[in-house]
Amino acid sequence: MGVKFDKDEFKKSVADNLKVLYRKTVDEADKQQIFQAVSYAVKDIIMDRWLATQKTYEKEDVRTVVYMSMEFLMGRALGNNMINLTVYKDIKEALDEMGLDLNVIEDQEPDAALGNGGLGRLAACFLDSLATLGYPAYGCGIRYRYGMFKQQIKDGYQIEVPDNWLKDGNPFEIKRPEYSYEVKFGGYVRCYKDEDGRDKFVQEDYRSVIAVPYDMPVVGYGNNVVNTLIIWDAEPVNTFNLESFNKGDYHKAIEQENLAKNIVEVLYPNDNHYAGKELRLKQQYFFVSASIQRAIAKYKKTNSDIRKFHEKYVFQLNDTHPTVTVAELMRILMDEEGLNWEEAWEVTTHCCAYTNHTIMAEALEKWPIELFSRLLPRVYQIVEEINRRFVEELKVKYPGNQDKIRKMAVIYDGQVKMANLAIVAGFSVNGVAKLHTEILEKQELKDFYEMFPEKFNNKTNGITQRRFLLHGNPLLADWITGKIGDDWITDLSHLSRLKVYVDDEKCQREFMQIKYQNKLRLAKYIKENNGVEVDPRSVFDVQVKRLHEYKRQLLNILHVMYLYNQLKANPDLDIPAQTFIFGAKAAAGYKIAKLTIKLINNVADVINNDPAIKGRLKVVFIENYRVSNAEIIFAAADVSEQISTASKEASGTGNMKFMLNGALTLGTMDGANVEIVQEVGEDNAVIFGLTSDEVIRYENEGGYDPMEIFNNDQDVRTVLMQLINGEYCRENPEMFRDIYNSLLHNDGGRRADTYFILKDFRAYADAHRKMLDKYKDEKGWAKSAMLNVACAGKFSSDRTIEEYVRDIWKLDKVKVEVSDED
């Protein structure tokens, strides 16, 4: 069901758009104007399908999943939309005939700054799969004006600057002011009796903003389905107070405007201070309240009985950020729709499902009662009542067991615990990899699992092959299609048919030549952006992901320092040349993570400029890691660094993207690494380090002293001393003292070497040597790389979504008809 593409009509559409938008011809327009004109021409193709999809959903009155997420890391839209419309090559030809280069045009588009890490990219992959599989769904998030931040590296330091992605406009969004809703903050709750003697609650003396939706299309691959991502902007109720302005009170004149603007300014405002915490809670409630109001309004267009709302809608809560959904839905059902508590609870507990993404305590959000109750007074009353009823249940089920109440209560010790709220009120709780779900059930959420075993299930994460192979690695995609056909584009399990080619020497050479071409492409990117020459024949060893101590970028760079020491001591060391590639953003307030970035860059500066090692070791930190440069990186990688402390990474999806592009995993038995090794076999990955059970045992029982390793391992001692002797910072030898101290000394309640970097160091070094030995065997390496691709079928987000549909959402596929089909 591809698009019937008319080349001449498309060319005319581009030319007409330039004329209407800019009063220019193709020859006169600049690159950004060409991008806008081409995007609007592609949007024209989308519109018929988008309208047809929405009409079909309304006509068939379908059950719909609303995917609620603070982040949607969508990347660039133009190329993805053309791929999924199956017109990419047609449009490339049309533009060639106009004298325009599609690659240059695509590069004009900024990545949509609606997310940051794996959480947001997962949400984007899920939307892609839902549309491709034909399931009724839409995403709800926030239209951040500046995203998290744009990362610049200056003198080795991360500098955060606003990511002004909307400065030229977003051609793929449509503002929908007719679906705006008021969202209220603060004030107090007045209770009164209605004529039937029932308690009624009204929020008074509040401040409010208007949530205005912008719709973005989510195009399914080759099937006419176009779902929607709704991103909410905040506008003031009254834009400008002329009376205050005329009195000279200029701040008050624009106070309403600033209240609204602040909510949507940035993703994850720094919450190291009270104002930042308040802003985060405001953001969460803002998009949740608007999204529920929109869903209920849509429901009431075709249904009259609000008590059956859960038969048509299910909210999937992506991590704890949107879990206030539970209480806000209760509020709307009771205060605005007139249901009693039991009726509202029946609806709510059948339409809220929660995905847990972490066992890190810091990410299981808790809000101080004072803040929560002041900002959301009526919602807090409802949370209090949910907690009161649940604690009564606990007292009956576990009489006298105060420890259970402490762990499981929604409100305890002055805090509102959002994960507990989601579990108590949700009908489903899922982890995102087998190991992660096991840890939740046996450790972190053990008490809840014992009480509600039927709620818990696993849904191993996945990625969309359409972006990370078909679009990101066209050379490999074409090669695969030439071997097995193109069914893999919508059913990744077909990749297993490549296994018959892994021993074929001609196929091995073709495969490795494609890898080499992709390495040349990345080397060119690095030269243009970093000014560093890297050898495309070296091993490209890559770690790109959010910077966090548990992900252990520090272990990686300490090992690079160790390798450098070895090469300096023995210039004839028989190891292949290596290029270590990092890409990561650290949260603005996360000091040790930012210091780790500085360390990586200082080490790079020393190593890359040392002629004595003859270019056999290079270190590159790729600035402003994002979806669009990730596609280039994944395609070029030889080694995929997945080295989180075992038990800490819920799943990871970068590991899957590397695997799909033919990189070998070097990692711990953590997250989805466990399942990757199960699929590809232990011979085609290199695993090292403590197991999750061993890590948890050390954390619970103690028995690990990093100082012992420091005293007994000369290599480790040398590397750590280089952190504080000026080796990598002559002007300030103490620069990296905090990193040194974190590895060797307890600090308050924090244990030395919290993430077992020194404990795993020697095993990591040995694993590296083993990986390099594999690389020297060219045929063996080619076979392993090909097997990684052939065994990646399980890790499609299409498979993940089918499991969510089967076990949680219970949706039906919808077929959308459009008149211009082939």
Predicted segments, located by residue:
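A conserved ligand/cofactor-binding region detector
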Residues: 1-822
